[in-house]
């Protein structure tokens, strides 16, 4: 009733409200866990150390493992965000302007399942598994949860909604693991740099992939079979995470902090 602009305005207003709760520094907060207080105190005791220059970061295999992982998988999330309305229109003749229920359900599932992904990592860690095993088993599970999107052409609409919701939630859980890998392999003074560097790679990959998606769909539309273009694209989406997992595992057989001699 208020137009699409109202969605952005509402989100912005809620964002400013949320900022109010973050104006106070953590050490001044009255609501704080003992573990958090101890971590903050320890961080303040650590001596400041110069970060690794960006150009030197590129010499480390740990850096390239994260760069390649995000280059391959970040684009899939942006595909899910941008192209799904067009997919439902092409595949089912669904008019998203009349009802956005499928998309609402998908993103609601993403929200819930992304949180559950963190419980898996915590569960494995509580069993006494090594960091390497916890991270890689979790990433493998999340990667496998995206694989079913390869077969969307064989599913009915609501099965596709469930599959895409699972895939989106798995991506968010995957991303959380990838972000954490930066702090697993680099000292805290370098985490921001490696996160920014790998994030840049992810966005470059996203631009290239969305452009390729557009050209692919246009070509198949010209052949009179626009929905078949999506079949190919979903095959790429479903295999990207497993490919990224294999590449990461080959580059980083064991997840460890960068050794002093490597710095």
Language model: regions and residue ranges:
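Intrinsic disorder in cytosolic terminal tails and internal cytosolic loops
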Residues: 32-49, 129-132, 251-263
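C-terminal transmembrane helical hairpin of 12-TM major facilitator-type secondary transporters
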Residues: 132-178
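Helix-loop-helix hairpin linking two adjacent transmembrane segments in secondary transporters
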Residues: 1-30
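Extracytoplasmic gate region of multi-pass secondary transporters
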Residues: 60-117, 167, 171-180, 206-214
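Interfacial helix-cap and linker-helix signal at transmembrane-aqueous boundaries
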Residues: 1-2, 88-89, 120-121, 125, ...
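Multi-pass alpha-helical transporter architecture, strongest
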Residues: 18-25, 149-154, 235-263
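Juxtamembrane intracellular "pre-TM" segments in multi-pass secondary transporters
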Residues: 31-67, 91
């Amino acid at each position: 009733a208020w137009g699409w602009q109202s969605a952005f305005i509402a989100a912005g207003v809620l964002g400013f409200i949320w900022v109010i709760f973050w104006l106070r520094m953590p050490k001044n907060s009255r609501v704080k866990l003992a573990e958090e207080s101890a971590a903050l105190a320890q961080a303040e005791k650590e001596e400041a150390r110069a970060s690794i220059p960006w150009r030197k970061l590129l010499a480390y295999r740990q850096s390239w493992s994260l760069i390649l992982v995000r280059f391959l998988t970040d684009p899939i999330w942006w595909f899910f965000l941008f192209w799904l309305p067009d997919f439902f229109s092409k595949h089912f003749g669904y008019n998203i302007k009349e009802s956005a229920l499928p998309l609402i359900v998908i993103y609601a599932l993403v929200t819930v399942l992304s949180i559950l992904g963190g419980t898996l990592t915590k569960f494995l860690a509580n069993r006494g598994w090594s960091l390497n095993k916890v991270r890689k088993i979790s990433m493998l599970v999340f990667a496998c949860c995206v694989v079913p999107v390869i077969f969307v052409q064989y599913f009915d609409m609501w099965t596709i909604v469930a599959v895409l919701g699972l895939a989106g939630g798995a991506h968010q859980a995957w991303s959380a693991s990838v972000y954490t890998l930066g702090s697993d392999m680099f000292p805290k003074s370098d985490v921001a740099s490696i996160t920014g560097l790998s994030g840049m790679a992810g966005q470059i990959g996203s631009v290239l992939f969305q452009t390729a998606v557009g050209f692919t769909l246009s070509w198949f539309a010209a052949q009179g079979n626009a929905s078949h273009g999506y079949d190919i694209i979903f095959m790429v989406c479903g295999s990207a995470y497993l490919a990224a997992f294999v590449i990461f595992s080959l580059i980083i057989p064991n997840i460890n902090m960068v050794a002093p001699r490597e710095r």
